[in-house]
Amino acid sequence: MQDFLRQQLERYAQRLEELNFLLSREDIMGDMKQYRAISREHADVTAIAGRYARHRQREADLAAAQDMLSDPDMADMAQEEIASAEAELVQLEDELQRLLLPKDPDDARNAYLEIRAGTGGDESALFAGDLARMYTRHCDAVGWKVEIMSANESELGGYKEVVLRVEGTDVYGRLRFESGGHRVQRVPATETQGRIHTSACTVAVMPEPDETQAITLNPADLRIDTFRASGAGGQHINKTDSAVRVVHLPTGIVAECQDGRSQHSNKAKALQVLQARLQEKERSEREAKEAALRKGLIGSGDRSDRIRTYNFPQGRLTDHRINLTIYKLLAVMEGDLGDVLDALQAAREAELLAELQVNN
């Protein structure tokens, strides 16, 4: 194990003793907010300290087995123990490196998934619908709950824009690298010559704001419009102005909702989406400054970055950020995204580990 990792892990053992003492104090037990915060840190530190204790134990076992090699009667047993200890130490070191990686507190949050049709007209809108279906099926498969916050349908099906709210465990951390430009190459249903067309959609994944950290909206900064909800092709689907559009005047950011049963419900949903978009704007600006100092492998998550190509004639999906190509596109479009998300997460962890080594 590298020295800088061992030094960090030693600090976790010391911190665990401090946290055990803090959790025993009456003043902290009486402050529920502080007690919960310390309890969360205690759980994280306990996991790391426990694995490090196991690592040290296996190092001691390895040293003892190596000492036994000189005894002819014990040599065979010692060889078995050495092989077992070395294999487990490799596994433990890999696990500890991952546990030490910096965590983004937003990773545990629910998320808003915004899909917009881009270049390609009707075909782009159809592909936006396919992406929404792909993500919804994946969420269903992993036990996440999906709610449509707003949807602007196109005449031939699909969406000009759709916003989904995804609720579950570690949603944002798992889906965050889906942000960017998604390009599709296929023969559209309306194509009579059999020619392959290229179109594109953009995806933005935004963490749902925490109530304590949500941006406070000044009513004077908002313009709230009501209008009749409409379906595909623009036809009105009710006779009351229940749909709501909220404009944040200082930034020009807009959110609208027409899927709820009442104007009150639609306004509440539109304000939720607006808060998420404003928070994401702040986050993007902050990360853009950091990205100017270092260019990450996976990219900034900017919706203008082309991140992935879906080639239907070849049954191929290519993620350009990590040079990943897989030939099971139909399964992916049915929601089988696990391999892609795992590869992106592994690339990000490798990137963070490299930064950790440089900084130490």
UniProtKB/Swiss-Prot annotation:
The keyword Metal-binding does not apply. Its main location: cytoplasm. It comes from the Bacteria. The keyword Protein biosynthesis applies. Keywords: Cytoplasm, Methylation, Protein biosynthesis. SUPFAM superfamilies: Release factor. It is found in: Cytoplasm. GO terms for molecular function: translation release factor activity, codon specific. GO terms for cellular component: cytoplasm. PROSITE patterns: RF_PROK_I. Methylated by PrmC. Methylation increases the termination efficiency of RF1. Pfam families: PCRF, RF-1. The modification N5-methylglutamine is found at Q235. HAMAP family: Rel_fac_1. Belongs to the prokaryotic/mitochondrial release factor family. Peptide chain release factor 1 directs the termination of translation in response to the peptide chain termination codons UAG and UAA. This is Peptide chain release factor 1.
